[in-house]
Design a protein with these regions (language model features):
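Tryptophan (W) side chains
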Residues: 2-5
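Conserved core segment of the aminotransferase class I/II
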Residues: 8, 256-296
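Short hydrophobic short-linear motifs embedded
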Residues: 13-16
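N-terminal small-domain helix-loop-helix segment of the aminotransferase-like
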Residues: 26-28, 39-130, 137
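Short, solvent-exposed loop/turn segments at secondary-structure junctions
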Residues: 66-70, 132, 156, 207-209, ...
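Conserved core of the PLP fold type I
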Residues: 87, 92-231, 242-263
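Glycine-centered flexible beta-alpha turn that most often forms the glycine-rich phosphate-binding loop
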Residues: 238
Length: 296
């Protein structure tokens, strides 16, 4: 189709076609918002990215982002290991791989989780682009519009944004100086069910909770596990900070006590480098197939 393009004084392009009237092209398709999916209409930029934009200003000392001190990394050793990997196994390392992640990496991840009392098989591990992708996969699998997700009050802003993108109703459960209060969890479950709502899972950060920083005691972990098991509610245990305690070891991960009801999320973003974007989900056997399909 032959077209003639003209630019008017307002620098808008006009395309003239022999079989159609003159149309004004301003660079944005007509009725663009109407073409979006319903869940995309209210989609907002990540609050975390907004924080990073402010933190990048030279006059700001930011305590907002959980950014590790990369100056402590053995850069020369990491460069040497990377070079050796590419030279000796580059054709494998740079090729397409399984959506579940490289088997040897999953074996190493199991060794890391063993430090927190978790006995896991590499076949149950799904490697993700940071644990943030794991949150997205879980939300995609579980959440329908208006389903309820229980979270600590306050909770990690990145998780809240993900749940809201999938149109979940987020119900906050009270905390104190020791973390999530079990009796408040019971009350939240009763109220939610009385209102006819479906609870899809409880999301919590037991170790050095973001943003409160508290460490959930072992007895509370057991009580919360018992409550959720009795109510048939999955627990999403997000544990980016578990290996960062130096004064005394953290209690064992909740996943160590319940392999069927706890979805465990881990990451190397705090212990190695966030730029690697390596996270993982350790899922119950009943969920593995859905998670693998969602990740591919």
């Amino acid at each position: 189709i032959w077209q003639t393009w003209l630019m008017d004084s307002g620098r808008n392009l006009r395309v003239v076609k022999s079989d159609s009237p003159v149309r004004i092209h301003t660079g944005e398709p007509e009725n663009l918002p109407e073409r979006f999916a319903h869940r995309a209409v209210g989609m907002k930029a990540s609050e975390i990215r907004s924080l990073f934009a402010v933190a990048s200003r030279p006059e700001i000392v930011s305590l907002a982002g959980g950014m590790p001190n990369l100056s402590a990394l053995p850069m020369e050793m990491m460069a040497s290991v990377t070079q050796k990997l590419i030279l000796e196994n580059g054709s494998e390392a740079l090729q397409y791989g399984s959506g579940q992640g490289h088997p040897k990496l999953r074996e190493q991840i199991c060794d890391v989780m063993a430090l927190e009392g978790i006995k896991a098989h590499p076949d149950a591990v799904i490697v993700t682009t940071g644990s943030q992708q794991a949150l997205d996969l879980i939300s995609r699998i579980f959440i329908d519009p208006n389903d309820v997700v229980l979270v600590e009050a306050p909770s990690y802003v990145g998780a809240l944004g993900t749940f809201k993108q999938y149109e979940a109703q987020v119900v906050h459960v009270a905390m104190d100086q020791d973390g999530l209060i079990p009796s408040a969890l019971i009350d939240a479950i009763k109220t939610t069910k009385a209102n006819g709502k479906k609870i899809k899972f409880l999301y919590l950060i037991p170790n050095y909770q973001n943003p409160a920083g508290v460490l959930l005691p072992a007895d509370r972990r057991s009580e919360i596990l018992d409550i959720c098991r009795a109510e048939e509610i999955f627990i999403v245990e997000d544990n980016p900070y578990g290996l960062l305690g130096f004064d005394k070891p953290s209690p064992n991960a909740m996943r160590a006590s319940d392999s069927e009801n706890v979805i465990y999320l881990g990451t190397f973003s705090k212990t190695i480098a966030p730029g690697l974007r390596i996270g993982w989900a350790l899922v119950p056997q009943s969920l593995k197939e859905k998670m693998v399909i969602a990740s591919e």
